[in-house]
Amino acid sequence: GDDGTLTIGENSNVQDNAVLHCDVGGAVMLGKSVTVGHSALVHGCTVGDGSLIGMHATLLNHCVVGKNCIIGAGALVPEGMVIPDGSVAVGVPAKVIKQVSAAQIEANLHNAAHYVEHGKLHAAELAKG
């Protein structure tokens, strides 16, 4: 976010070692209830509400990940690629392989809510000194 705008939606979480970055004048936009997994790189792109970005995934400039998507661990979403709402995309380069099930959408939202609660517990412990 040092060279552009960084927006993280309500109930979203960015896990350990993940990097959110953009070029000068660019932007990173995470919707609501997004989970960005450990060591993912999210660079100058948009991620829709309820999506899960897997560990070590890479999202490049101007790509768009729709709502309620799953980007598999280690996937590479190339510059400018659009992943439609409700898609599962994996691989290098990423390819949509199927649609997300209702159970997977619910699990993603539950996962995001869990990390919000986890964060509140850590904040309370830190406040105790």
Q: Which sequence ranges carry the predicted segments?
A:
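Glycine-rich hexapeptide-repeat left-handed beta-helix
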Residues: 2, 22, 27-30, 37-129
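A positional/architectural concept
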Residues: 1-22
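A general structural signal for well-ordered alpha-helical packing
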Residues: 15, 31-33
